[in-house]
Amino acid sequence: LTWQVGPDGAITGFEQADCAGEHRFEVSLRQDLATYPTAEFGPDAPMPNQTRQAQLREELCGAGTLRYLSGKYDPNGRYSIAPILPPADAWQRGDRTMLCGLQETDRAGEPVLTSGRVADQDQARVFEAGQCVAVDAANTLTDVPCADPHQLEITSQVSLADVFPDSTPTVEDQDSHLEDVCTAAAQD
């Protein structure tokens, strides 16, 4: 799916898009909240608030999205699992379809344009040598000017896929390999 965001934050042009091209949201599954086992989403029910939407994301979207990605999801990576509810007028007419999917967001948490299917992407947050990175309270990594407060300065990129081509390495295996590699990069 994709859409445009106006200067005032208004969303227009909400439409289906080919995941190979630019888009803001990749649908992983559809949930019909009308079949949810309570009257919470009945014909006269109000739309869920932000807190309830976050709960629904955890309850209904996580496992299905992980299956959609064949188990390959980096929860600390570029993409987050998110729900999209129908517009308010469609909700009032009885539409209870919740779309679960994946999106990449900017610093403000707004979905940004991305290209390609998530399953085919490197999900890691990658920074270039020389960039400085701040870590916020939610452990989100953001590149910042090095004159600003930051916790990391990138000295090198290392592809662990080259070293561990057949499996995901344990944290201990990563640390063992990276100790010498990163120390050498910092000294250079």
Identify the function of each model-found stretch.
Residues 1-188:
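Primary mode marks residue(s) on the alpha4-beta5-alpha5 output face of response regulator receiver
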